[in-house]
Amino acid sequence: MNPLDELRRRIDALDEKLVELLNERASCAMRIGDIKHQLGMEIYQPEREAEVLGHVRALGAALGGPLGGDALTRVFERIIDEARRLERESTSENKAPHDAGAGG
């Protein structure tokens, strides 16, 4: 196998792991959305999002690698956006029919 094919196979394997981890993270986000709903909390928690992004930037700096803090922040902003969407969908699906007209 030539080096290009080897690297592409490695990327495919890494992508598989990333998808598994992203789905695991998404499942956690959906459970968090349910808990927030039960506690009457807002889905959007700017302090927590800032904490996550700061943690990611710190990990990037500590671990090094070609992706700098700005790139990692952009990637995780998208991940967080999708997690927030899933939290909203999860809570709207779990509302009882009599809650649907309650205005949020």
Outline where the language-model segments fall.
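Domain-level signature for soluble enzymes in the chorismate/prephenate branch of the shikimate pathway
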Residues: 1-104
